[in-house]
Protein backbone atom coordinates (compact mmCIF):
# COMPACT_ATOMS: atom_id res chain seq x y z
CA UNK A 1 0.00 0.00 0.00
CA UNK A 2 1.04 3.60 -0.42
CA UNK A 3 -0.04 7.14 0.44
CA UNK A 4 0.99 10.28 -1.36
CA UNK A 5 1.69 13.72 0.06
CA UNK A 6 -1.27 15.17 -1.84
CA UNK A 7 -4.55 14.06 -0.21
CA UNK A 8 -6.29 14.53 -3.57
CA UNK A 9 -4.32 11.61 -5.02
CA UNK A 10 -5.12 8.05 -4.12
CA UNK A 11 -8.91 8.36 -4.36
CA UNK A 12 -11.41 8.71 -7.18
CA UNK A 13 -13.32 11.94 -6.39
CA UNK A 14 -16.42 11.15 -8.45
CA UNK A 15 -16.88 7.73 -6.86
CA UNK A 16 -18.46 7.22 -3.44
CA UNK A 17 -16.55 6.40 -0.29
CA UNK A 18 -17.93 2.86 -0.51
CA UNK A 19 -16.90 2.50 -4.16
CA UNK A 20 -13.36 3.71 -3.40
CA UNK A 21 -13.03 1.19 -0.58
CA UNK A 22 -14.50 -1.56 -2.75
CA UNK A 23 -12.05 -0.80 -5.54
CA UNK A 24 -9.12 -0.93 -3.11
CA UNK A 25 -10.45 -4.12 -1.52
CA UNK A 26 -11.00 -5.92 -4.80
CA UNK A 27 -7.64 -4.81 -6.15
CA UNK A 28 -5.71 -5.96 -3.09
CA UNK A 29 -7.63 -9.10 -2.16
CA UNK A 30 -7.51 -12.53 -3.68
CA UNK A 31 -11.08 -12.02 -4.92
CA UNK A 32 -10.79 -11.75 -8.71
CA UNK A 33 -13.51 -11.06 -11.25
CA UNK A 34 -15.83 -9.50 -8.70
CA UNK A 35 -17.71 -6.34 -9.68
CA UNK A 36 -18.94 -3.39 -7.60
CA UNK A 37 -22.54 -4.59 -7.77
CA UNK A 38 -21.35 -7.81 -6.16
CA UNK A 39 -19.88 -6.31 -3.00
CA UNK A 40 -21.55 -8.27 -0.23
CA UNK A 41 -23.33 -6.86 2.80
CA UNK A 42 -20.57 -8.43 4.90
CA UNK A 43 -17.93 -6.44 2.99
CA UNK A 44 -19.99 -3.24 3.24
CA UNK A 45 -20.25 -3.80 6.99
CA UNK A 46 -16.47 -4.28 7.17
CA UNK A 47 -16.01 -0.95 5.34
CA UNK A 48 -18.45 0.75 7.75
CA UNK A 49 -16.58 -0.62 10.79
CA UNK A 50 -13.19 0.48 9.44
CA UNK A 51 -14.57 3.95 8.66
CA UNK A 52 -16.01 4.22 12.19
CA UNK A 53 -12.49 3.77 13.59
CA UNK A 54 -11.55 7.08 11.96
CA UNK A 55 -14.03 8.93 14.19
CA UNK A 56 -14.86 11.31 11.33
CA UNK A 57 -18.47 10.27 10.70
CA UNK A 58 -17.63 8.79 7.30
CA UNK A 59 -19.36 5.51 8.11
CA UNK A 60 -22.67 7.39 7.78
CA UNK A 61 -21.67 8.96 4.46
CA UNK A 62 -20.57 5.88 2.50
CA UNK A 63 -22.70 6.83 -0.53
CA UNK A 64 -21.24 10.37 -0.70
CA UNK A 65 -18.72 11.24 -3.42
CA UNK A 66 -15.15 11.39 -2.14
CA UNK A 67 -14.75 14.78 -3.85
CA UNK A 68 -16.93 16.30 -1.10
CA UNK A 69 -14.50 15.28 1.66
CA UNK A 70 -11.87 17.52 3.24
CA UNK A 71 -8.20 16.84 2.59
CA UNK A 72 -7.80 15.19 5.99
CA UNK A 73 -10.83 12.98 5.48
CA UNK A 74 -9.52 11.96 2.06
CA UNK A 75 -6.07 11.16 3.45
CA UNK A 76 -7.59 9.06 6.24
CA UNK A 77 -9.74 7.26 3.64
CA UNK A 78 -6.66 6.68 1.48
CA UNK A 79 -4.90 5.13 4.49
CA UNK A 80 -7.84 2.76 4.95
CA UNK A 81 -7.81 1.94 1.24
CA UNK A 82 -4.08 1.15 1.39
CA UNK A 83 -4.59 -1.18 4.35
CA UNK A 84 -8.11 -2.61 3.80
CA UNK A 85 -6.24 -5.81 2.95
CA UNK A 86 -3.05 -5.91 5.02
CA UNK A 87 -0.13 -5.09 2.71
CA UNK A 88 3.37 -6.53 3.06
CA UNK A 89 4.74 -2.99 3.14
CA UNK A 90 3.18 0.46 3.54
CA UNK A 91 4.92 3.38 1.83
CA UNK A 92 4.09 6.81 3.25
CA UNK A 93 5.36 9.74 1.20
CA UNK A 94 4.93 12.84 3.40
CA UNK A 95 1.36 11.67 3.99
CA UNK A 96 0.60 14.32 6.64
CA UNK A 97 2.50 17.26 5.11
CA UNK A 98 -0.50 18.88 3.38
CA UNK A 99 -2.80 18.61 6.42
CA UNK A 100 -3.50 21.07 9.21
CA UNK A 101 -1.73 20.17 12.50
CA UNK A 102 -4.78 18.65 14.25
CA UNK A 103 -5.73 16.51 11.24
CA UNK A 104 -2.10 15.52 10.65
CA UNK A 105 -1.89 14.29 14.24
CA UNK A 106 -5.12 12.33 13.84
CA UNK A 107 -3.92 10.69 10.60
CA UNK A 108 -0.51 9.93 12.13
CA UNK A 109 -2.13 8.33 15.20
CA UNK A 110 -4.36 6.27 12.92
CA UNK A 111 -1.28 5.26 10.92
CA UNK A 112 0.54 4.16 14.09
CA UNK A 113 -2.45 2.12 15.24
CA UNK A 114 -3.00 0.37 11.88
CA UNK A 115 0.72 -0.38 11.46
CA UNK A 116 1.03 -1.76 15.00
CA UNK A 117 -2.21 -3.78 15.01
CA UNK A 118 -1.48 -5.39 11.64
CA UNK A 119 2.31 -5.66 12.10
CA UNK A 120 2.91 -3.89 8.79
CA UNK A 121 6.41 -3.01 7.63
CA UNK A 122 6.23 0.73 7.04
CA UNK A 123 8.55 3.13 5.23
CA UNK A 124 7.68 6.75 6.00
CA UNK A 125 9.30 9.65 4.21
CA UNK A 126 8.94 12.82 6.25
CA UNK A 127 10.54 16.14 7.07
CA UNK A 128 8.83 16.05 10.47
CA UNK A 129 11.51 14.62 12.71
CA UNK A 130 9.16 14.23 15.68
CA UNK A 131 6.93 12.00 13.55
CA UNK A 132 9.98 10.06 12.40
CA UNK A 133 10.90 9.35 16.02
CA UNK A 134 7.35 8.38 17.02
CA UNK A 135 6.71 5.84 14.27
CA UNK A 136 8.82 2.80 13.70
CA UNK A 137 12.00 1.34 15.05
CA UNK A 138 14.59 2.78 12.69
CA UNK A 139 15.33 6.33 11.54
CA UNK A 140 17.41 7.18 8.50
CA UNK A 141 18.44 10.76 7.75
CA UNK A 142 19.61 11.80 4.31
CA UNK A 143 21.57 14.73 2.99
CA UNK A 144 22.02 15.38 -0.73
CA UNK A 145 20.72 11.90 -1.57
CA UNK A 146 23.09 10.11 0.82
CA UNK A 147 22.20 8.32 4.05
CA UNK A 148 24.13 10.18 6.75
CA UNK A 149 22.47 8.76 9.85
CA UNK A 150 21.02 5.31 10.61
CA UNK A 151 19.61 4.94 14.12
CA UNK A 152 18.02 1.66 15.20
CA UNK A 153 16.19 0.05 18.08
CA UNK A 154 17.64 0.91 21.52
CA UNK A 155 19.64 3.87 20.24
CA UNK A 156 16.38 5.54 19.11
CA UNK A 157 14.64 5.25 22.47
CA UNK A 158 14.45 8.56 24.28
CA UNK A 159 15.89 10.56 21.38
CA UNK A 160 14.54 14.06 20.88
CA UNK A 161 14.50 16.25 17.79
CA UNK A 162 17.39 18.21 19.34
CA UNK A 163 19.35 14.95 19.66
CA UNK A 164 18.71 14.18 15.98
CA UNK A 165 19.87 17.66 14.97
CA UNK A 166 23.07 17.18 16.96
CA UNK A 167 23.71 13.73 15.45
CA UNK A 168 23.07 15.15 11.98
CA UNK A 169 25.53 17.99 12.64
CA UNK A 170 28.15 15.49 13.83
CA UNK A 171 27.61 13.20 10.84
CA UNK A 172 27.55 15.86 8.14
CA UNK A 173 29.57 18.63 9.69
CA UNK A 174 26.77 21.11 9.04
CA UNK A 175 23.56 22.21 10.69
CA UNK A 176 20.06 21.84 9.32
CA UNK A 177 18.78 25.27 8.44
CA UNK A 178 15.43 24.49 6.89
CA UNK A 179 12.73 26.17 9.01
CA UNK A 180 10.16 23.57 8.01
CA UNK A 181 12.33 20.83 9.49
CA UNK A 182 13.35 22.77 12.57
CA UNK A 183 9.79 23.82 13.41
CA UNK A 184 8.28 20.36 12.91
Name these PLM-found stretches:
Residues 50-67:
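Conserved ABC nucleotide-binding domain
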Residues 126-127:
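H-loop/switch region of ABC-family ATPase nucleotide-binding domains
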Residues 146-172:
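Conserved beta-strand-loop-alpha-helix hinge in the C-terminal portion
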Residues 82-83:
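ABC ATPase C-loop
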Residues 15-30:
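Q-loop/switch helix immediately C-terminal to the Walker
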Residues 104-117:
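Helical segment within the ABC ATPase nucleotide-binding domain
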Residues 94-95:
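Walker B catalytic motif
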Residues 100:
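ABC-family nucleotide-binding domains
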Amino acid sequence: GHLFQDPMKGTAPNMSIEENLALAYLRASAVKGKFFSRISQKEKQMFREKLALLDMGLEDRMKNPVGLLSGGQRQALTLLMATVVTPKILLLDEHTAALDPATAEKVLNLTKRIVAENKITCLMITHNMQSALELGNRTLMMNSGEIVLDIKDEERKGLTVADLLEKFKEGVGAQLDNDRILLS
